[in-house]
C-alpha cells in the first residue's frame, strides 16, 4: 500500500503551519523560512525500506526506514527524535518522540493529492501536496 505514496510531491498549500512550528518551539527566523519554503517530497520504496527525501531551497533531508521499526531522525529544525512510521489502512503514520514530547504526521491520498496532517498536542496543521 505504500506504493500509493511513491511519487514526487510539491507543496501546494499549507494551513496553520506557523502555529505548529511555534508549538514545537521553532524560533522566529526558522519559522519565517518554513512558512515561505515550498518543499518537494520524494517518496520511494527501495526493497523493504521506504525512503522520504525532502528538498527545498532551505534544507534537504532524507530518512530511510522499515515500516514499524524505530529509527533515529534529525528533523529540519535539528530535533533528534526516535521515530517510527507505520501503515494504518491507507494512511502513512509517522510518529516522532524527543525529550518526553511527541508529534505525528498522517499522510493520506485524497483526490490524487497527498494530504499531510501534523499534530502536536492540540495544534493541528494541514499541508496539501500535488504530484510534480
UniProtKB/Swiss-Prot annotation:
Positions with a binding annotation for a fatty acid: 127-129
GO CC aspect terms: cytosol; nucleus
Keyword terms of this UniProt record: Acetylation, Cytoplasm, Lipid-binding, Transport
Modification type N-acetylvaline: residues: 2
GO process annotations (BP): brain development; fatty acid transport; neural retina development
SUPFAM superfamilies for this protein: Lipocalins
Tree of life domain: Eukaryota
Any one GO molecular-function label of the UniProt entry: transcription factor binding
Compartments it resides in: Cytoplasm
Description of its domains: Forms a beta-barrel structure that accommodates hydrophobic ligands in its interior.
Its job: FABPs are thought to play a role in the intracellular transport of long-chain fatty acids and their acyl-CoA esters.
Family: Belongs to the calycin superfamily. Fatty-acid binding protein (FABP) family.
Name of the protein: Fatty acid-binding protein, brain
Organism from which the protein derives: Gallus gallus
Amino acid at each position: 500500500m505504500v506504493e500509493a505514496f511513491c511519487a514526487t510531491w510539491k507543496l501546494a498549500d499549507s494551513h496553520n503551519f506557523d502555529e505548529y512550528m511555534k508549538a514545537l518551539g521553532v524560533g522566529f527566523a526558522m519559522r519565517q523560512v518554513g512558512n515561505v519554503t515550498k518543499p518537494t517530497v520524494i517518496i520511494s520504496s527501495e526493497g523493504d525500506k521506504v525512503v522520504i527525501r525532502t528538498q527545498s531551497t532551505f534544507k534537504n533531508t532524507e530518512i530511510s526506514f522499515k515500516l514499524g521499526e524505530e529509527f533515529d531522525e534529525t528533523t529540519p529544525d535539528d530535533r533528534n527524535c526516535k521515530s517510527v512510521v507505520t501503515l494504518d489502512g491507507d494512511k502513512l503514520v509517522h510518529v516522532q518522540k524527543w525529550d518526553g514530547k511527541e508529534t505525528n504526521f498522517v499522510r493520506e491520498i485524497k483526490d490524487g493529492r497527498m494530504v499531510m496532517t501534523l499534530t502536536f498536542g492540540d495544534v493541528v496543521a494541514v499541508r496539501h501536496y500535488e504530484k510534480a
